[in-house]
Amino acid sequence: MTRTHCALAVLAATLVTAPAASACVQVGVYQDDPAAQLPVLQKRAPGVRWLSAYVTGGRPLDPALVRLANKRKVGLVVSWLPDGGTDGATQPQYRLTKVTAGRYDKSLKALAKRLRTVRRGAVLRPMPEPNTPWYAWSGTVNGNKPADYVAAFKRVRKVVRSAAKGKVKLLWSPYARSVPETPENALAAYFPGAAQVDLVGVDAYNFGNAGDLTWSAPADLFAEAYAAVQALAAKPFWIAETGSVSTGGDSAAWVAALGALPAQMPKLAAVVWFDAKQAEGDFRLTDKPTLTAVKTLAKGKC
């Protein structure tokens, strides 16, 4: 997705027991206004466990999000975006070498310390979707290389681990399909190593049949990426961002199909729905069948 959809926003996640799966699967919903939307979601889908925010560069994590997470008794997931908070990948002042050189060490330490105050646990998701050309930290633009991303991720981990005192988990989250699909931009080129991550995952969306696109089932989007990521590290797997439009198919059935994925992906630990409207598509849970499907998905308890 574009940098626009990575603006400061929030998701809430619930634990479910998916069909044919022995492990719990966290189901998340990305939302624009968590203070207003999270309580409503918790009423409609009991068992909410996570709240997640996007934080840009050296900016601090809004303490109101921590207070909200603690009040609603959820954990906090933070996606960290080392740029200036504007669209566009070509921003030389935000190249990955700046991260590795320690430009953000102070703000990362502050972020880690604040995350330690979340009572239900915290996850940090640094520099998501690096195998796309959309961001200042992407590995094929802005003077970056995949190796620069690996070095930057390791720097983030080192700083956060020291400040977090073991209370923050790190999630590595590329896009499910590399853009462009070239050998040098392969998903594996961005993997920092199994010892550097606690969780692994990918993002992907069903954009329906708009333009020259075709309807994509969840298994079509994630099966290949799941296999590739698990080959790198057999760790808990997150579908860190996803959503489906209604144009061209049945979005409620699409959500139900998410519940069947653990049968094919036994390490699947979380699914996060992008409950918002963007230029790329309208993924909001506004129609009753889709909302009901999400509610059903969120009924189970671990």
Language-model features, listed with the residues they occupy:
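Secretory targeting and sorting signals
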Residues: 1-23
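Aromatic-lined carbohydrate-recognition surfaces of secreted/lumenal glycan-active proteins
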Residues: 153, 157-185, 234-248, 270-276
